[in-house]
A protein has these predicted regions:
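Conserved PLP-enzyme active-site core in the AAT-like
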Residues: 44-160
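Conserved N-terminal alpha-helix of the aminotransferase class I/II PLP-enzyme fold
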Residues: 2-49, 66-71, 75-76
Length: 160
């Protein structure tokens, strides 16, 4: 509790953030060469920050959705980012679309486990090692319950 009310810029605040990052790396098996950032707000802010900063409008992008949060990421891609080379891949609520149809050169945004529907991808076999596209993964409902294939995930977001 000694850090409550203290700035994240203070020595104590920085130490607590470093501890949270180090513990996250250890608990989740995040590789040493992966960067970990802590953002204010929720996973919504984190995934939107990743989308806004990592998706290139000149590249093809696929956003896959099978539950409510994935549909929010589609709306962000369509209405906010206005990505011109956008492929939307959806399935009925609670069903998983055929992810093997996503071109490996495309950047891809997906939700690992549907928080609201419970539908989850079983693995990342549909992502080829060394694929060309950037992979942005909303792992909020999966990060502490599923094994993450870090080698295939460029940006993984979650909330505590």
């Amino acid at each position: 509790t000694e850090s409550l009310g203290r700035s994240h810029r203070s020595s104590l605040g920085k130490a607590r953030l470093k501890y949270a990052i180090d513990l996250s790396r250890e608990l989740l098996g995040i590789p040493d060469d992966y960067l970990i950032g802590i953002m204010p707000a929720s996973d919504t802010g984190a995934i939107e920050a990743a989308m806004w900063s990592m998706l290139d409008p000149a590249r093809p992008v696929t956003v896959a959705a099978w539950e409510s949060f994935g549909n929010v990421w589609i709306q962000d891609a369509v209405k906010q980012l206005k990505l011109p080379n956008l492929q939307v891949l959806t399935a009925d609520y609670g069903e998983i679309p055929d992810l093997t149809t996503i071109p490996q050169r495309n950047d891809v945004v997906f939700t690992w486990n549907g928080t609201t529907s419970g539908a989850k991808i079983p693995n990342t076999d549909w992502l080829e090692p060394g694929r060309e596209g950037v992979t942005i993964n909303d792992a909020t409902s999966a990060i502490f319950a599923m094994e993450m294939d870090w080698a295939k995930l460029d940006a993984t977001t979650y909330s505590w």
